[in-house]
């Protein structure tokens, strides 16, 4: 597979599962004081005036993208399996995501640019995920939070330290459906090991 084909597949997945339309963006609002239609399917926020984002009443929401909401410590999702895509970027004080384990049908998730959740154990319950990105998360823990039976096809570890763990390659090797891996910067020794242990995975550095 060529580099362009790799990028095209990545782009198609993001377009399918996450919204990035500036026309639908809510900027620096107190979201909990808003009254969106109950059948809202897409929520795109940039910034937040509240330290809690409560989406629990939107039981038809499918896509949530939150960027730069640095005040937010807690996100509350609906107690119903409805969210198919969750994107969280530049939220350095986020501590918890309530009800996320209800959303077993989730297909896309990214935690990018300094999201400092204390752990990612909830991902073990989300076995239908296809795409998972941790771009620029320097303190990412070991990968025991990803279940071997996961349907994950695409993993992104650009600008992380994940390959400093001796266990990383064995965890990746256990993911039978993994096909695309963005490693970020790695040493020649690490690249050789990855190619040897993951011969069926298409890889790029970034």
Feature-to-residue mapping (PLM):
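Concave beta-strand-loop units of leucine-rich repeat
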Residues: 3-95, 99-118, 122-141, 145-206
């Amino acid at each position: 597979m060529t580099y362009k084909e790799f990028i095209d597949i990545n782009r198609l997945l993001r377009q399918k599962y996450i919204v990035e339309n500036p026309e639908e963006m809510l900027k620096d609002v107190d979201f909990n004081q808003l009254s969106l239609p109950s059948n809202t399917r897409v929520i795109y926020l940039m910034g937040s005036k509240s330290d809690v984002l409560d989406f629990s009443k939107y039981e038809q929401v499918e896509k949530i993208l939150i960027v730069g909401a640095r005040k937010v410590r807690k996100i509350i999702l609906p107690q119903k399996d409805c969210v198919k895509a969750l994107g969280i970027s530049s939220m350095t004080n986020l501590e918890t995501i309530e009800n996320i384990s209800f959303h077993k049908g989730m297909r896309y998730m990214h935690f990018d640019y300094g999201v400092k959740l204390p752990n990612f154990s909830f991902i073990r319950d989300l076995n239908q995920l296809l795409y998972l990105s941790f771009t620029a998360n320097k303190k990412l823990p070991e990968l025991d939070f990803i279940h071997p039976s996961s349907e994950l096809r695409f993993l992104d570890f650009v600008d992380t330290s994940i390959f400093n763990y001796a266990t990383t390659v064995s965890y990746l090797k256990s993911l039978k459906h993994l096909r695309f891996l963005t490693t970020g910067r790695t040493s020649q020794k690490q690249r050789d090991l990855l190619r040897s242990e993951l011969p069926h995975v298409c890889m790029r550095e970034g």
